[in-house]
Regions:
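Short conserved catalytic/interaction loops centered on acidic-Pro-aromatic/His motifs
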Residues: 78-79, 97, 132, 309-321, ...
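Generic, well-ordered alpha-helical scaffold segments in large soluble proteins
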Residues: 87, 202, 213-217, 227, ...
């Protein structure tokens, strides 16, 4: 068995900054993995290329019988995997993919009629009803370590070699803090308290097991478990409705809102210079560290979309650029909820007034606020 990792240039070449914390995190994790493999006489083979080109090199360098990877639910990833599967098929190589980053995926938790849920609460109830300990079993990976292809260690390409720079970011540990999980329901909504796990980046990039976390949460804190269920829910939505990952609203009617889209106000929101302390603190923390407390994410997002009437997709894109734990499904899911809330609010306002209301005429501005 030959472990490989591909720094996908289709993704990396689109990143706006050479100082990207996510790339630095992945690079650090790969170096740690390489150290573990070296102790077993194996080596991680790292490519910096498009996935298709990387596999073209692999089939030239090695005699390959099977390729194994895990499911990825993002639109680009699905197209990528289909391309690789076709290429491997042309070379008589089997391609196997497996569930790994969620507890339940795709069609595993659906309505009784087989249709996907679009509302979280009934999905959560069905998720919990479906759950049993067998879904949280750990896999005895140690039994298979002797299957690694034995070869001398190869260095992981430096960040500079793949076009990126080191960052001064201190990455959170991958070990769950049990005290935080136990108190999560009581402390999670207070930004001044270290009451969140900071494990989002590890869940995003697979350096911690979702099953391990869910197993702990089932006995320690149901509120924490609910957050993991939200993660499954958003991945399920992205799978069944891939258009949401391509800049489109969940439903077409959510796009009728007439946004103000003031570019100067958006720039001040991005920089943390709105004059609203909680908003500014959150945005400045995001820019400086790549982290923002979940409650503050909700506040800053609501401020942008509901007060400034700036298209939520502008904020979604900015968070996607800056968040260390950026996950397309969760980021899109949380931002797109704002468009639904606004759609409902405006519809209710129309009913109350008895006439059509153009919300773009509301006085939503930060120009006159103190800085």
């Amino acid at each position: 068995m030959l472990p490989i990792f591909i720094f996908d240039t289709n993704i990396l070449d689109q990143l706006p900054s050479a100082t990207d914390r996510r790339v630095a995190f992945i690079h650090s994790a790969l170096n740690q993995l390489q150290q573990q493999l070296t102790q077993m006489g194996a080596s991680l083979q790292v490519y910096h290329d498009t996935p298709l080109n990387a596999f073209k090199k692999l089939v030239q360098q090695h005699t390959i019988d099977k390729v194994f990877t895990n499911h990825d639910y993002e639109p680009y990833a699905r197209e990528r995997d289909d391309t690789i599967a076709l290429f491997l098929q042309q070379h008589n190589i089997s391609f196997y993919t497996y569930k790994d980053q969620v507890i339940f995926e795709k069609q595993e938790v659906v309505k009784d009629d087989g249709k996907p849920y679009t509302v979280f609460t009934p999905y959560s109830r069905k998720w919990k009803a479906t759950m049993d300990p067998s879904y949280l079993k750990s896999f005895p990976t140690e039994k298979y370590f002797n299957n690694f292809h034995q070869q001398s260690a190869r260095p992981v390409p430096s960040l500079n070699a793949i076009g990126f720079k080191e960052t001064d970011t201190t990455f959170p540990p991958a070990t769950p803090d049990k005290a935080v999980i136990k108190q999560y329901d009581k402390q999670r909504n207070f930004p001044a308290i270290e009451g969140t796990s900071h494990l989002g980046v590890h869940l995003r990039f697979g350096t911690i097991s979702i099953r391990q976390l869910a197993k702990q949460a089932t006995t320690m804190n149901e509120t924490f478990l609910n957050e993991l269920i939200w993660r499954d829910f958003f991945q399920m939505i992205l799978w069944h409705f891939p258009h949401v990952g391509k800049g489109k609203a969940f439903k077409p009617e959510y796009d009728f809102i007439q946004w103000r889209n003031n570019e100067d106000e958006f720039a001040r929101w991005c920089a943390g210079n709105t004059g609203y302390p909680i908003v500014d603190a959150g945005m400045r923390e995001l820019n400086a560290t790549g982290f923002m407390h979940n409650r503050v994410r909700m506040i800053t997002a609501s401020f942008l979309a509901k007060h400034l009437l700036i298209d939520w997709r502008w904020g979604e894109s900015y968070f996607a650029e800056k968040l260390l734990d950026f996950d397309l499904a969760s980021n899109n899911g949380n931002w797109s909820r704002l468009s639904r809330e606004l759609q409902v609010a405006v519809a209710m306002q129309r009913l109350i007034s008895g006439s059509s209301i153009r919300i773009c005429k509301q006085k939503s501005s930060i120009r006159s606020l103190h800085t």
